[in-house]
UniProtKB/Swiss-Prot annotation:
Its EC number is 2.7.7.6. This is DNA-directed RNA polymerase subunit beta. InterPro entries: DNA-dir_RNA_pol_bsu_ext_1_sf, DNA-dir_RNA_pol_bsu_external_1, DNA-dir_RNA_pol_su2, DNA-dir_RNAP_su2_dom, DNA-dir_RNAP_su2_hyb_sf, RNA_pol_bsu_bac, RNA_pol_bsu_CS, RNA_pol_bsu_protrusion. Keywords: DNA-directed RNA polymerase, Nucleotidyltransferase, Transcription, Transferase. The gene is rpoB. It holds the Pfam family RNA_pol_Rpb2_3. GO terms for cellular component: DNA-directed RNA polymerase complex. It comes from Prochlorococcus marinus (strain MIT 9515). The keyword Amino-acid biosynthesis does not apply. Belongs to the RNA polymerase beta chain family. One of its GO terms (biological process) is DNA-templated transcription. It catalyses: RNA(n) + a ribonucleoside 5'-triphosphate = RNA(n+1) + diphosphate. PANTHER family: DNA-DIRECTED RNA POLYMERASE I SUBUNIT 2. The lineage of its organism: Bacteria, Bacillati, Cyanobacteriota, Cyanophyceae, Synechococcales. Residues 1077-1091 have a biased composition (Polar residues). DNA-dependent RNA polymerase catalyzes the transcription of DNA into RNA using the four ribonucleoside triphosphates as substrates.
Amino acid sequence: MSSSALQIAKTATYLPDLVEVQRASFKWFLEKGLIEELKSFSPITDYTGKLELHFIGEEYRLKRPRHDVEEAKRRDATFASQMYVTCRLINKETGEIKEQEVFIGELPLMTERGTFIINGAERVIVNQIVRSPGVYFKDEMDKNGRRTYNASVIPNRGAWLKFETDKNNLLYVRVDKTRKINAHVLMRAMGLSDNDVVDKLRHPEFYKQSIDAANDEGINSEDQALLELYKKLRPGEPPSVSGGQQLLHSRFFDPKRYDLGRVGRYKINKKLRLTVPDNVRTLTHEDVLSTIDYLINLELDIGGASLDDIDHLGNRRVRSVGELLQNQVRVGLNRLERIIKERMTVGETDSLTPAQLVNPKPLVAAIKEFFGSSQLSQFMDQTNPLAELTHKRRISALGPGGLTRERAGFAVRDIHPSHYGRLCPIETPEGPNAGLINSLATHARVNEYGFIETPFWEVEKGRVIKEGKPVYLSADLEDECRVAPGDVATDKSGNILANLIPVRYRQDFEKVPPHQVDYVQLSPVQVISVATSLIPFLEHDDANRALMGSNMQRQAVPLLRPERPLVGTGLESQVARDSGMVPITKVNGIVSYVDANEIVVKDVDGNEHVHYLQKYQRSNQDTCLNQRPIVKNGDQVISGQVLADGSACEGGEIALGQNVLIAYMPWEGYNYEDAILVSERMVTDDLYTSVHIEKYEIEARQTKLGPEEITREIPNISEESLNNLDEMGIIRTGAFVESGDILVGKVTPKGESDQPPEEKLLRAIFGEKARDVRDNSLRVPKTEKGRVLDVRIYTREQGDELPPGANMVVRVYVAQRRKIQVGDKMAGRHGNKGIISRILPREDMPYLPDGTPVDIVLNPLGVPSRMNVGQVFELLMGWAASNLNCRVKVVPFDEMYGAEKSHQTVQAFLKEASKQNGKDWVYNPEDPGKLLLKDGRTGEPFDQPVAVGYSHFLKLVHLVDDKIHARSTGPYSLVTQQPLGGKAQQGGQRLGEMEVWALEAYGAAYTLQELLTVKSDDMQGRNEALNAIVKGKPIPRPGTPESFKVLMRELQSLGLDIGVYTDEGKEVDLMQDVNPRRNTPSRPTYESLGTSEYEED
């Protein structure tokens, strides 16, 4: 293929930096967030008020990290920097001031790619979307079908305040869902007189009933109101006026306990049209009165008052890394404050220094807990560059302070009109998290308040103004404008052509003339997320399939020789660049040196810039990270140019799969139900071969009987098996290993008790044996094989941090090449996925008129019912492009260039391809897009013409090698005594109720009995059966399954007298075989078979 790519449809868009969300947020934390927190805790005074400790937040500094990123990964360390802050201790009595720089903890730093390295693993902090603080007005139906209204004031942290009305038109208030209190009681407790309240309201007559109700209860002074408030909020405690005052103040007016946050203050001011200054973050009397006023206007149905939609993106905000980390730092500082106060009280006031007071542990623990075990700190998905990029742009509604899967209803998960251009309507997981985990749209950004904004071009008198920068609008602002979609047709100077334009206005669609349009979307792609925007002809796919297509691109395994798509969307290079997988030069200059490990660029001033390349590193998902240079020595490069390809990249563009020749036709039933028939060429030419790197680890521990030893001298092992081990007993790099081979030899000291009787006898006869050790080596697991890539040895002497009790840790990395095989999962970009059912020799595959055999045969029945016709467009466009020897970029949503544009373009390209020399067979106008294929086995043509073309097909990470599994004898569950489940536990196959029904229906009684007893949890039966098989005797009758006994015991423990009886009414003792069996192991071994119980009579 030539590297020229034709851009069909010009997009006037360049994408923003796609990882900006993460980077900007962390930068804000370092510059502002951390200082804000340190300042808010300063000063800390002791209980007597003698000592004051000030944190001087602006003067905090970070030390250089101890390890750089690569070193941290290799040593399993955290890439972090030490934080120091200047503290000032003031003794009020003597006036003495001590100033000192104090260590307050380690802060993990973000790498350039927007990730964190915690204990050697790359992690991502996912953005969280939560309800914005502010005031919300809702309506509810009471049980008589009458509408009541309520208002909630939700702070960033602190108590919720909820105002509600009842059927008698009385106003009530609840604090944090406690019992309701007459609203006027709260007003009086806050020190407001009746007139203060009445003057502020536009319709005081509604409120007067609440005043009367308060008077009727005998609460007519501030003191009585405070007592009443205290009774309601703290029932059971003796009320007092001072207690009431303190309670009210701490609940709503103390900045440490109640904080609306910058956003909350902004939202309240905006909703209630107030002018309270930005830095007042607690409730004011004005807030409460305006809320009551607004609520009364709602009740009386007076214009200007509107209800809030809590799913509107104007009422939900994004908390990114910076803010989540700031909240965590606050938790740590809260604990620290308590410790400091205690130490101030206990210590000698004169000799105290700031360093003695400040203990870094609570802050370190809080930060560590956040990065290590928070729901939002996730192990990065590194399957391919797209997976990595999408993970950083993910927005989750779960996590601390968010929703839970079980509680989230349908409304929260649903697509909302305000998502347009902000959250992708397509990319979300299938299953219980659907709609709770979203992806940021391509052009969206998060503003300073945490609301998502999206860009537009302004329209003046029907002309789109594309000069200068686009205007970013948040969901609130956009609601008030008439916004046209990005694919409206315009002339050269930007005048809108149509007479009526469909626009969105206040979450509805209407048609207006061009001069009424306020804004036009930047690009048709801005509605969808990055992964979705890589699907060509997306507009022809059903949404459910586009969702699968988006999600499956993230699961594509990087191939040995990746190939970028013939039909792309034009965003491929940006995705590769922003994922951080490809090295980019930051200067203009000349490439002065290139080899496999580094690229050196000399800039204009003669300075050398070295770029080290990643070679065969293991990713989090065991795929292979490797970079290959694409520049040559002496090449001119400009700033921002890609120097090398990463995994799943080619020519600086993302390349997740291969372009293969596909035919849509049934073939001997091998592609029934989404199965895929592939040609042997895929295996022999390594089209879908990928490299996987497994990590195996063993530690030599200190045991009670002495240390374990890593050695070559392993008992009862032939010299042949030790061929590839070095003198230490560790495998040499480059060795090929099969399953069961020793990677690291290790022996463990063995105690007296570990010896079987025959060995004791031998030792008694022949005296002391040389050493008493047991083989405990690290071996290659079943079903695995490969080549040793790297061996790393960690010891305390080298200064490595080891787990407690370990003397040495050895890690072996084994690489395997996995060719495609039957059982692997493959997929296209349109949600068309399937499993390989057969690999045919290429001579048997159907072939084209020029003799080319096809690579893949798919079932045409997979298209109509699933409505993902985009795959057919891609197929034919790819066919034309391959014959024209070019690559094509098609932007989704192309109707702005005319109706049925996709169709016309593909037809035009096919016609163009057939005009080439000797290629007239490529396009048949009678049957466009179809060719008459011949059967490779007989050479006869098939009955019907078949759709053939090139499509981009991916191999997904669900490989059969990782799933195939068999068990003979293995571990059992302790309680039920049934075999465990799953490959990792060496488990058995589950026989569920449906399988039992099938065997019952078939009448296979003995097979069924065997499956439910001796092959599962009849303990005595399975031991006897094994014994019988070993000795060649008939298998005895099965006994009672253990799980049945457990059920009986459980029912008996409820006090039910339940037993099993024979026909004659004689009770069967289920527990008769329990006692003798206690001595034998639960897992039959050949040693236990030799014991006297099972001896022949």
